[in-house]
UniProtKB/Swiss-Prot annotation:
Region (Disordered) location: 1-23
Gene3D superfamilies: 1.20.1280.50
Species classification: Eukaryota, Viridiplantae, Streptophyta, Embryophyta, Tracheophyta
Superkingdom of the source species: Eukaryota
Segments forming domain F-box: 27-74
Protein name: F-box protein At1g69090
Native species: Arabidopsis thaliana
Length: 401
């Protein structure tokens, strides 16, 4: 489809209609060749794409052969106990879009991961029939715009299902890959064509001191982070193969303030670290970053430390204070180019606390500007009016009709 089947959930009062481009100049724009028109449409973001469709009937027809070139992160909100999502586009802050009905079991599920417009869904723990150890979990993948669904085979887990989840899918071929851990020592994957979940034979074993902190998958490589090392595994063969590792003890130990623990009662409360998250990022240019997100007691917002890997130096990690013309989508493990692009804040971190087992808090999904060290909550009008169970940033993919 040329744009998602979305209904407006909220919008401002209608304004007086403006004179359209076709009324001002009825001959020039309507007679563009279709191939040239498609070149125009393929360069438009969602909002401009929707505006261009209304220029004239020939542009309306041309839009059906194209799709928006969306590079702007949107926000998904999951209203409590509802079988649909709400989508917020920062480029058009006055509107909120509602998806189609996403299935009777959608409200009873949690989203583990996203890839473009695809969601990796798992039943809520309280919805399981038998809440015991070695519980069986049935996951599925859902396109929130087309409602296409892919069911995955069941697996048993002695924790709350799939942890450190990764979803990757090719929109054209529908090839997909799901990765995660099902206990402290076992990592599994499933891809199209498999009959069951496969265990990884060579990945590092977690322990109390070296448990997995974060995983991301990009360009057929799995990046795995624990308290000691960052590992990179190639996924070009039948089984993953370790291609690279680098110590992270210097950075991880530095960023995680020990004052967060009770054995330091003399430390003022405001200096105690009560929560931290580590994320790996692969930038547009291919650099590998680690972002430490830190929340101190009595602090109004989170703090961030960013380090860049440089394996050519003795000191392998270098702290950086600017992303230049890029912005980080923390939960997706990537950066996007943001310079001169309306709707996205340059040199910023698009942050989500990303804990689907905790209650949703509207102040834990925001945009952190590294230039000003200030937080922007662009969706505040939404959060105040619609109770939500969860929210996260994503990059939607729009399809042709």
């Amino acid at each position: 489809m040329a744009s998602p089947t979305l209904a407006l959930a909220q919008s401002p009062p209608p304004k007086s209609p403006a004179v359209s481009v076709s009324q001002r100049n009825p001959h020039c724009w309507s007679k563009l060749p279709l191939d040239l028109m498609q070149l125009v449409f393929e360069r438009l973001a969602f909002l401009d794409f929707e505006r261009a469709k209304s220029v004239c009937s020939s542009w309306q027809f041309g839009s059906k052969q194209s799709k928006p070139n969306n590079q702007i992160p949107w926000m998904i909100l999951f209203p409590t106990d509802k079988n649909y999502c709400l989508l917020f586009n920062p480029e058009d802050k006055e509107k909120l879009y509602k998806t189609q009905h996403l299935g009777d079991d959608f409200a009873k599920s949690i989203v583990l991961a996203t890839y473009r417009s695809w969601l990796l869904m798992q039943p809520r723990y309280e919805e399981l029939e038998d809440q015991t150890l070695d519980q069986e979990f049935h996951l599925y993948i859902k396109d929130l715009l087309t409602c296409e669904r892919i069911n995955l085979p069941a697996f048993e887990s002695d924790i709350f299902g799939l942890s450190h989840p990764i979803l990757w899918i090719d929109d054209k071929t529908k090839d997909y890959l799901v990765i995660g851990t099902i206990n402290r020592e076992t990592m599994v994957s499933f891809k199209n064509g498999d009959n069951s979940w496969k265990k990884f034979p060579e990945l590092p074993k977690s322990s109390c001191t070296d448990m997995c902190l974060n995983m991301i998958y990009k360009d057929h490589k799995l990046h795995y982070l624990d308290y000691s090392n960052l590992y990179i595994y190639d996924f070009f063969g039948e089984f993953p193969r370790e291609a690279f590792r680098i110590s992270v003890r210097e950075f991880v130990g530095y960023a995680t303030n020990p004052y967060g623990y009770d054995e330091f009662p003399e430390v003022p409360l405001k200096l105690k670290l009560n929560r931290y998250i580590y994320n790996m990022i692969v930038t547009v240019r291919g650099d590998v970053l680690i972002v430490a997100s830190l929340h101190f007691s009595m602090a109004e917002t989170w703090e961030f430390i960013i380090c860049k890997m440089d394996s050519s130096k003795v000191n392998k990690w270098e702290e950086i204070v600017s992303l230049g013309d890029e912005s980080i989508l923390l939960g997706l493990g990537i950066t996007v180019l943001a310079k001169d692009m309306e709707g996205i804040t340059c040199n910023s971190i698009y942050f989500t606390a990303d804990d689907f087992y905790e209650d949703y808090e509207e102040n834990e999904i925001f945009i952190y500007n590294l230039d000003t060290n200030k937080v922007e909550i662009p969706h505040q009008f939404v959060s105040s009016s619609i109770p939500s169970a969860h929210a996260r940033w994503f990059l939607p993919t729009f399809k042709r009709d």
